[in-house]
Amino acid sequence: MVAPYYADEYVSLYLGDCREHTEWLGCDVLVTDPPYGIGWRGVSTTYRRGVCVRRSSPEIAGDRDTSVRDEVLALWGERPAMVFGSWRRPRPAGVRHRLIWDK
C-alpha cells in the first residue's frame, strides 16, 4: 500500500501511476488528469527580442493513445468522476457532461 501524497480529514491525494497503485479504488469520487492521448512532444517556440527560442521537455508517458484513461475508467466503473482530457480525442463512453476550460 502506498501512502498518500497529501491527506487530511476530507481528501487523500495519490501521486503515481494509478495502474500500479490501487488504493484510489476505495475513494468516493475520482479526479484525474491522465495522459490525453495526443502524443505531446514537449516542444515550444517563443520569440525573445526577435530571436526564436525553442524549448524541449520530456514526453508524457502513456500519451500515445487513450488506453491509460480508458483502463482507469474501466476500473472505476459508473461512480462519480472528473476526468481532464482533450477535445482532440473522442470522449470516453458514459460521459454525461463536459466543461470547456479555455486557458
Predicted regions and their residues:
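Core catalytic lobe of class I
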Residues: 4-103
